[in-house]
Amino acid sequence: MKHKVRHIHFVGIGGVGMSGIAEVLLTLGYTVSGSDLAASATTERLAAAGAQIHVGHAEGHVHGANVVVTSTAVQADNPEVMAARAAGIPIVPRAQMLAELMRFKQGIAIAGTHGKTTTTSLVASALGRAGLDPTFVIGGRLTAAGSNARLGSGDYLVAEADESDASFLCLSPVMAVVTNIDADHMDTYGHDFERLKQAFIDFLQRLPFYGRAVLCIDDKHVREILPFVTRPLTTYGLTPDADVRADNIRPVAGQMLFDVVWQQQGEEQRHPVTLNLPGRHNVLNALAAIAIGLECGADIGAIAAGLTEFSGVGRRFQRYGDIALPAGGQATVVDDYGHHPVEMAATLAAARGAFPERRLVLAFQPHRYTRTRDLFEDFVGVLSTVDALLLAEVYPAGEAPIVAADGRALARAVRVAGKVEPVFVERIADLPATLLDQLQDGDVVLTMGAGSIGQTPGRLVTLAGTQAA
């Protein structure tokens, strides 16, 4: 690719999926430019690495580019897309550029409705600790690396495979993980769950005959597609029939301790693991990483060490520490990207396990009106399990409002359910101050959502420090 393409332009370069690919291409020596609607820490990091960054979109930004890369959030009438089309510059989706990178490595693609980012990060950590130095492109900032992407010297490229727009069907990995299959982004699949399942089967069929599918059979929908997978297969889970399973699981001080059990040359093998993450759902994510590591020939001791040393990924049960409250005492702040009822329930269970006997305060910003509408009753159920609830207005992600699927409607439904009295916060900017007024000594406050609520924990910490002073 390099002898024909020198300059690659990204429209929407600040996005987490786009920025990772851009960073790897910069390291490979390509000229990278890009635009986004606003500057951010991500665009500043890319600029420091040598990318030419434009704030805002304009036709002239694509001048000199050999190819233009777009994310699914970029519309066809974007001025840079239109200028590239008029100039005959190839326009490729993000997933296609990731597929090009994967052609030069042995691709390991992590798919599934929930857990992709954490699992991808754990795989990268385990393979790195085993000396395999993988390249990775992750949908979140890996704390140890300070970035969501890195070019490694090894043979493997570990990346998330996105089913939300079916773009994972562009990829041709050598190994693939499916963590679970759940109803989300159903507009892509005509609101037909069977079509969604078939897409995962088609994704796995893109593996070569010598490849490896690593599937979580604790998930009933993943188990349902097993008969249709015709590639070499490794299963993982907590169930006794899994090829790689966890035994003797116990939570200790925010970590999960367990024994991993697997077969090797007909003999049962067992090794203790200390996972530096809370929650049984993260035990499953760790099992996927172990299965991949074993398939890559890594030593189980090195794999386990990588899981123990794992320092987390941004916005995945990210701990901000304790804040001082204006009325005295302290509260612990944790932030998480969860925005689907299933992953929210898993994260809330992890929080209960990590902080037993403490009041759990959830500040949640729903993401997309369509998701809120389609999963309304599920949201009411999971939101009713916390001790105190603050609800922000829906983050639209480009969608128009839908009647009876906004934050107020959700708050009313939770109130009617009668298990918790929600506080509705219309302006996300008011959430930190409202939280401080609500918090009590010893509380754990968990901010959750995929939208602008990600800025709330930092602002809460700053505001608390100002008021405490």
From Swiss-Prot:
Enzyme superclass (EC): ligase
Pathway info: Cell wall biogenesis; peptidoglycan biosynthesis
Coiled-coil ranges per UniProt: none
Keyword ATP-binding among UniProt keywords: yes
Keywords: ATP-binding, Cell cycle, Cell division, Cell shape, Cell wall biogenesis/degradation, Cytoplasm, Ligase, Nucleotide-binding, Peptidoglycan synthesis
GO function term, MF aspect, one: UDP-N-acetylmuramate-L-alanine ligase activity
Bilayer-spanning residue ranges: none
A Pfam family matched in the record: Mur_ligase_C
EC number of this enzyme: 6.3.2.8
GO annotation, cellular component aspect: cytoplasm
GO biological process: cell division; cell wall organization; peptidoglycan biosynthetic process; regulation of cell shape
The keyword Nuclease appears for this protein: no
Function as written in the Swiss-Prot or TrEMBL entry: Cell wall formation.
Listed NCBIfam families: murC (TIGR01082)
Entry's family note: Belongs to the MurCDEF family.
Protein's recorded name: UDP-N-acetylmuramate--L-alanine ligase
